Amino acid sequence: MYLISLRGNILGVDSKKENKPYQIQEVIRMGLHCWVDVWWHNEGFYLGTNEPYYPIKPAFLNMFALWCNAMNFETLIKLKEQKAPHYFQWKGEPLMTNTLHIITDTISEMGLSDTLLITDEYDSLNLPLKGIISDNIASFKEG
């Protein structure tokens, strides 16, 4: 099962570390995967929660265990060109990654084995999910 840190958060939301490249690398060194918010801005890639903030090199996006959330349509196109693992969230609806995983915050009986669930509910570990996405992912790793 994939354990995916939401924006580099490990033990709850830490806005000072969210989407910070160093924090993302630390999460991956811990053996976790990481969801990052990616922007295409001023002819380059950036990470940032509400706006493009941290400039990154394109190679950063191809790091193993990274899940790239395109923050707008232009970014989605650029991520596709980069061949980075990516998806584009549309109005909170369930979405599908380019690697055919489903990301959602609700559970459906269909497709659980391909589903990445956004949750902080620990009983979700008993489901046959593909992975868990959480701001508190360390709790899942310990459990």
Where are these regions (language model features)?
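Phosphate-group recognition and catalysis centered on beta-loop-alpha active-site segments
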Residues: 1-143
